[in-house]
Amino acid sequence: MAESNGKGSHNETSSDDDDEYEDNSRGFNLGFIFGNVDNSGDLDADYLDEDAKEHLSALADKLGSSLPDINLLAKSERTASDPAEQDYDRKAEDAVDYEDIDEEYDGPEVQVVSEEDHLLPKKEYFSTAVALGSLKSRASVFDDEDYDEEEEQEEEQAPVEKSLETEKREPVVLKEDKALEYEEEASILDKEDHMDTEDVQEEEVDELLEGTLDDKGATPLPTLYVEDGMVILQFSEIFAIHEPPQKRDRRENRYVTCRDKYKSMDISELVEDDEEVLLKSHGRIDTHVEQADLIQLDVPFPIREGLQLVKASTIGGITPESREFTKLGRDSCIMGELLKQDFIDDNSSLCQSQLSMQVFPLDQHEWERRIIWEHSPEISGNSGEIFEPGLEPEGMLVKGTNSETEQESLNVVNSRVQVQADNNMFVPFSANLLESFGSRGSQSTNESTNKSRHHPQLLRLESQWDENHLSGNDEAGVKKIKRLEKDALGRFSRLVLRERDLGDEAWLDSIIWDSEKELSRSKLIFDLQDEQMVFEIFDNEESKNLQLHAGAMIVSRSSKSKDETFQEGCESNSGWQFNLSNDKFYMNGKSSQQLQANTNKSSVHSLRVFHSVPAIKLQTMKSKLSNKDIANFHRPKALWYPHDNELAIKQQGKLPTRGSMKIIVKSLGGKGSKLHVGIEESVSSLRAKASRKLDFKETEAVKMFYKGKELDDEKSLAAQNVQPNSLVHLIRTKVHLWPWAQKLPGENKSLRPPGAFKKKSDLSTKDGHVFLMEYCEERPLMLSNAGMGANLCTYYQKSSPEDQRGNLLRNQSDTLGNVMILEPGDKSPFLGEIHAGCSQSSVETNMYKAPIFPQRLQSTDYLLVRSPKGKLSLRRIDKIVVVGQQEPRMEVMSPGSKNLQTYLVNRMLVYVYREFFKRGGGEHPIAADELSFLFSNLTDAIIKKNMKIIACWKRDKNGQSYWTKKDSLLEPPESELKKLVAPEHVCSYESMLAGLYRLKHLGITRFTLPASISNALAQLPDEAIALAAASHIERELQITPWNLSSNFVACTNQDRANIERLEITGVGDPSGRGLGFSYVRAAPKAPAAAGHMKKKAAAGRGAPTVTGTDADLRRLSMEAAREVLIKFNVPDEIIAKQTRWHRIAMIRKLSSEQAASGVKVDPTTIGKYARGQRMSFLQMQQQAREKCQEIWDRQLLSLSAFDGDENESENEANSDLDSFAGDLENLLDAEEGGEGEESNISKNDKLDGVKGLKMRRRPSQVETDEEIEDEATEYAELCRLLMQDEDQKKKKKKMKGVGEGMGSYPPPRPNIALQSGEPVRKANAMDKKPIAIQPDASFLVNESTIKDNRNVDSIIKTPKGKQVKENSNSLGQLKKVKILNENLKVFKEKKSARENFVCGACGQHGHMRTNKHCPRYRENTESQPEGIDMDKSAGKPSSSEPSGLPKLKPIKNSKAAPKSAMKTSVDEALKGDKLSSKTGGLPLKFRYGIPAGDLSDKPVSEAPGSSEQAVVSDIDTGIKSTSKISKLKISSKAKPKESKGESERRSHSLMPTFSRERGESESHKPSVSGQPLSSTERNQAASSRHTISIPRPSLSMDTDQAESRRPHLVIRPPTEREQPQKKLVIKRSKEMNDHDMSSLEESPRFESRKTKRMAELAGFQRQQSFRLSENSLERRPKEDRVWWEEEEISTGRHREVRARRDYDDMSVSEEPNEIAEIRRYEEVIRSEREEEERQKAKKKKKKKKLQPEIVEGYLEDYPPRKNDRRLSERGRNVRSRYVSDFERDGAEYAPQPKRRKKGEVGLANILERIVDTLRLKEEVSRLFLKPVSKKEAPDYLDIVENPMDLSTIRDKVRKIEYRNREQFRHDVWQIKYNAHLYNDGRNPGIPPLADQLLEICDYLLDDYEDQLKEAEKGIDPND
């Protein structure tokens, strides 16, 4: 090197070593290539040939003026060469740079630093006088420069072009790393405050050498210093890096003196090579960085804020110390806030620090820092530097760990001693300061490692910041620099000593920050398109504009300053110190530029997607989707017409009505508000109150609807029948204009997330741009929720590398989103290739990518916006685009997968965390039912398992369980909650629900994966129907969203390498016509025929090859091979010449050729011999790409908008628009239509046809059930709003009684859980869907969306909370029902073991006979029932009773009754059925007598489980159930003294009553009345009413007992006390017909006669005769007459039945052939069944005579009693037939009223046939079949006073309300009149249908004239 090098070190070392590397003086670096040199700088041996010597001499002459300290100058003078060779190394003007610009340094992970990297650092061979200049031009051959930047640098740095040329062989260092390589690189700024986008090092070189180097010396080579304008080369720097590793020890040995001096501190033997790499590059602690000053990337890294950047200036000289200290290494950082420490004045400490410097082994140090430099030449004023003065006193800190070296400490101090530059002084070097070791090797390593932490953007930020800061404090900086010069040595000593403890972070606590002076930042230049940058800026004025308009994320400044450390290679800051696996060293060693280049080439063109804050917090996503939400998942429906909740209408009167009336006013947007109004207030007053809640002016025109009718503003609520707790819909009709909606938010608001869209209100369309996107797919795989972000990108495919049109697209205003330019060699980001020179826009999210195609926006198109409060607004649309087929990036969750369960658990935990810390934890717990409802797909066990970790499970006094927050639970940070559930996970889950919903409606519930039916398909028989159905199921399972997304992601996750594994075309095509891609996985082989597969399988069991199959050519005989060849048209002459094997070979060849050419051959004879055509993998890929490109082009052509095509099809488009308008009107009509006032059961009974002019298809049972469930959920929400006040009152005071509170519904706690022995949540068992309202504003609707909901009988069908469920074996099971007084409450009740007890006294469940609450407690033993079958009483089925059949058990009535939970009113249950069901089931009217002292009305009470299903389920639902038997337990015990007093009340009937005065059956007032009987009423009941009389309690009982006992539903026949209890079984048949219902009626004394007949059949004549004689003495004459009248009526009824059948037989011939055939068939079936029943009855009768016992069947015989009566056999047969008829018809229809007269029955039969005929004429009668609902015609009842329809007429016929044909015709005429009255002028097509209907009716009446006359004659006019 320079001669000064040798003088500084050779004096001590030259005599100690004589090997080839012994000289460390001038030119010692030449020894690496030229051999050893002597003391004079000459070579000690002639190693060079003549050419090399000439070249070296020429080079020395050229640079001679720059090498004053090297004796090589003399050598060069002696060996001067020709002038022509003087420019040998000059870069020619036409020189071409052949370096690969993509060739970059791979970093320490790939290129491990060798030993010579540390032995010979580049800085150590620099001249002391050129410390600054030589370090500035770092573009040596050791650096892998980005030559694109160097070309630009050459234009700006022409003077140094030549000097930098020869250094291109230096090892590669990335350009962004060089900025921090040395202190000089980071400390020089351009004088003109210019900041370019190139490396800081390049501009620093330009500033240093500007004006000092002439054009001749501007060679881009490493320089030692500048002298006389010439650049001096540094040969050792060029060649020393190539020193072999094995010579390292020998080089160390030549420093004998230095080595001995520091030998005591050398521990190089303890450190391995890999540890050296680790210690030099890993774990560097940037403790000086404050959080507020960070600019973060994806991998956090610190900004070296305190880095001192110096500006080029002129100084007179520089001290030796400054020369040392100016060599600031890359690994040292200087804080802008320095430590408050004074420097030690003792300069001798610098010498003493030499020992302390040697802390680590020599191989870990930059040992060349020990070289002592002397006689440094004076530097010219232009090459000096001035240190930045403004930041010096703020503080200083050296970063490093045990891996850092003394060089870092020296460099820190060196940077401070530069300050002598201002004084223009030259101080000779006098101290023995050693340079730090490792300035080359470690820096090369550290540069690469720091590269991951420092973005190129940071270089400009740092430079600009320091440059701006330098300008204002020059004067103060001079003083600080002087002080630093004085204290440098002491400070250096202490910092080096402290470096040992840098690994221990305790020293961080001792840092004192000087915050007296606020450091201001200058305006920064940001790359707003760089999405990888995350800025954190100060909250000052100049940064606000940047914050609002930055493209990258901006993180607000932390409120608390923290000293944080960072670790390269870690994902986050937290816990980096525990990263012991050294992940950085196992990362891919490519640089960020290389990774970015590879990323672009691999088609991963993705930008970061930002979501709004509400979306990240899942505030815009429902925890549970309703069935309507899932059904309309891909096409959400808006409600534009008021929709009444039928359940709410039914229950509104049952809610509390105390105080003012509560009304819920709800807008169509979904916003509801509860208002308190007086019942006499007007609607205008209600509207005024609603205006304050729903934010509209009182003067604004709004409409209010109640039950489909618009309310009049002037009338009061009471006058318009607005009930308490009602739901009133408010419709705002005014449309507001938003002309300025397209304006962007103001300057004080952000435009992009996360700064923008921080609240849900920010997500509205009231401002900003609106793009409408329409998906071309019917069911896109995934859809984003509200608030989720998406990126718009436009890809441009270059046609050539020089194509610059992509840059022009960025400047065009119509370009969508970011422009991504694809090079010619890049792959397309889509399945199809983008054509060269073309662009394609796309929308990209984290879930999918899809192409978009802009469409022409019509000038007349506007967007109508409706707010949640119902406000309508109109705004412009910015763009409208069509979204092509999605390419998923993530998989949709699969049902039953582990990912699904994990998501559900995490979603629940996130919900619970947020609720706990929002509610306050313990004060507002979370009900367990709430979690079960919201996360119904999780079982209770899973919920409890996960909740126990964070919450405590408790119960309240009502037995309700809830969760409270644990005291030790800490609120997790929001970032952790975001990681648990991302918005994309929610979308994936909702897509899965939509897929399951579709499968459910297709009837596919057992399979969710196509693989699950492969075995099932193999087992199917070869039947076309079965195979077609299986194929349909398989196809539907293949196109589920989870299968399609999984297939695509699996096949494209490796750069679309396996796209050929998809079908591309086929069933998965969403367009269905070749415009989309099919993501169904391709079958590995074509499926063979089923028969062929079986044969192959059968043969395969014997041998694994084709041997033995039909395709085996070896099985062909000579003749068979000849026949096959003849089919191939081979001449017989050729065949005859060939042998058998030649024939077989020819068959194989010909069949394979035809199969390959596509010729169709018979697959069973010829084609089966063809060999399969196999393609190579490349051929398959090419074929798949061609398919994709073909589909892509078709999709592009179809979805792109072309003006020409639009103009050509304008007329067609207009016609389509008209058609669409008509369809839209029909849809709106359908929305307004709905079901009206039809009950919920009517939804199951809808007919195919039209309502009005709209076609309405018949809804499936699944849809009906879902609609019912959604209404129940909606009603639960309404109840929650209504009961808020009640709940608040209950929290303040205890409930005084069960009868107080909010009424019978909704209950505060659910008692609707299924009461059965099986677990509720068992799979495939029974799905529970109970509804309950919680007082804490929560509600419960348990369901399972994944399971098969086989039958949903919602609580609408049982308004009092009762539900009907069916399990897998189709046996109905009911819940417990308790009937109490009015205003009762419902709460969940534990099922105790007591309920299994059966009382031996009264037969009731729940207590024993010794219980004082028993009705028969302490009663005489004689009065207790005898012979009770305990098995039957306990609910065990007998031999004649199917298992599981429910019973109507005795009703519990005791003092404990007020504790019961549920009140059930069969009365109300039947009301809901009377509009929709064909029959009302079997309503019963009970009348009973009670003690005279208790005559108040009381409802009937039932014991738990007493009403199972017969009376409630079948009656309420009107749906045929599997449980067909209803039982009434009739107590057979009666007091002897009661028999006489109660003889008047001994008539028992199970038939509904018929009131002749009113002409209608009381059974059609569905109720269970509990009215007490007065003495006069009892007599009337005996004669005119057919009731079940309940006797009073025994008069012999104590008074208190009698009063405490309330009347039971215990029916006692008039028998002696010794009679055991009997059961009357009523079965309902499975047939659905409405004939012979008159046979069901019985006389008031039927119960007595029944008992007598049973006794007669038992054969006890003697007892009967005795009983008759006894009773005849007691019976009064009046009663005798009644008795015989009943007998006559019974006989007459039997004759009427026969007459009716005769009428039926006569009418068969007159009816149409189809009807006649049906009636004949029914009659045959009926007669056969009756005959079977008679035979069974006879057999039973014979058995009973032999062995009388209690049996349950159609005929029941009582055990023998002495007082039993005996009646004729004829009466018994009549009773049997009555029961049989009742069983046959009761399933569908309510029991028909009694038809007492033959004429009435005949007339009813004829009229019913006429009605049925009219109903069959659907083309005429379809509009008149059902009553007109309010939704079809809201004003219908206002216009039509007497509505009539065929259903009503049929009901009146069955009730025998018509006395003649004129009454019947009048009702048909009423239909015609109503049709004209309402539809004239509205629907002109309807009145003609009504006219035609009346004409047909008249024709039928004439046809039946004779029969009608005969029937009318038999009708008593006085009757």
Swiss-Prot record:
One of its GO terms (cellular component) is transcription factor TFIID complex. Residues 661-737 form the Ubiquitin-like domain. GO terms for molecular function: histone acetyltransferase activity; RNA polymerase II general transcription initiation factor activity; TBP-class protein binding. Residues 1566-1587, 1661-1671 have a biased composition (Polar residues). Residues 1794-1911 form the Bromo domain. Residues 1713-1750 form a coiled coil. One of its GO terms (biological process) is DNA-mediated transformation. Residues 1-25, 143-169, 1287-1314, 1408-1679, 1726-1746 are annotated as: Disordered. Pfam families: Bromodomain (PF00439), DUF3591 (PF12157), TBP-binding (PF09247), ubiquitin (PF00240). Residues 1736-1745 have a biased composition (Basic residues). It is found in: Nucleus. Residues 1465-1476, 1535-1547, 1555-1565, 1628-1655, 1726-1735 have a biased composition (Basic and acidic residues). It comes from the Eukaryota. Keywords: Activator, Bromodomain, Chromatin regulator, Coiled coil, Nucleus, Transcription, Transcription regulation. Expressed in roots, leaves and inflorescences. Residues 143-158 have a biased composition (Acidic residues). Transmembrane segments: none annotated. TAFs are components of the transcription factor IID (TFIID) complex that is essential for mediating regulation of RNA polymerase transcription. Core scaffold of the TFIID complex. Component of the TFIID complex. TFIID is composed of TATA binding protein (TBP) and a number of TBP-associated factors (TAFs) whose MWs range from 14-217 kDa. Interacts with TAF7 and TAF14B, and (via N-terminus) with TBP1 and TBP2. Belongs to the TAF1 family. This is Transcription initiation factor TFIID subunit 1. It comes from Arabidopsis thaliana (Mouse-ear cress). The gene is TAF1.
